[in-house]
A protein has these predicted regions:
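Ca2+-coordinating acidic residues in Ca2+-binding motifs
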Residues: 13, 30, 61
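Polyanion-binding surface elements
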Residues: 3-24
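A near-ubiquitous, low-amplitude feature marking generic local secondary-structure context
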Residues: 1, 14, 45-48
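Residues at alpha-helix termini
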Residues: 17-18, 38, 69
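Membrane-targeting and insertion segments and their boundary/processing signals
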Residues: 1-5, 9, 32-39
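Major-groove DNA-recognition helix of helix-turn-helix-type DNA-binding domains
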Residues: 21-56
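A short, Lys/Arg-enriched interface patch at domain edges and termini
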Residues: 55-72
Length: 72
């Protein structure tokens, strides 16, 4: 498996990396839920410019995700 890279990711692509056994829509839901349920993560994402309708995650946002969830 290729080493995970911190880069801009389409939201759905990163969601599927974290939830590879889920269908696309389910992976999106679980990923969003995880952001809300992980203490401090939602606030950190918003501080990096994340909004509910964000389609592409920036490198800074991906760093926050990895900080809270680890690499996919």
């Amino acid at each position: 498996m290729e080493k995970f890279k911190i880069k801009d990711y389409p939201f759905g692509e990163l969601a599927q990396l974290y939830y590879p056994d889920h269908k696309y829509d389910s992976a999106l839901r679980h990923f969003r839920d995880e952001m809300h349920l992980t203490r401090g993560m939602w606030e950190a994402m918003v501080a990096q410019g994340y909004k509910e309708n964000t389609k592409t995650l920036t490198r800074a946002q991906v760093r926050v995700i990895v900080q809270f969830l680890g690499e996919p």
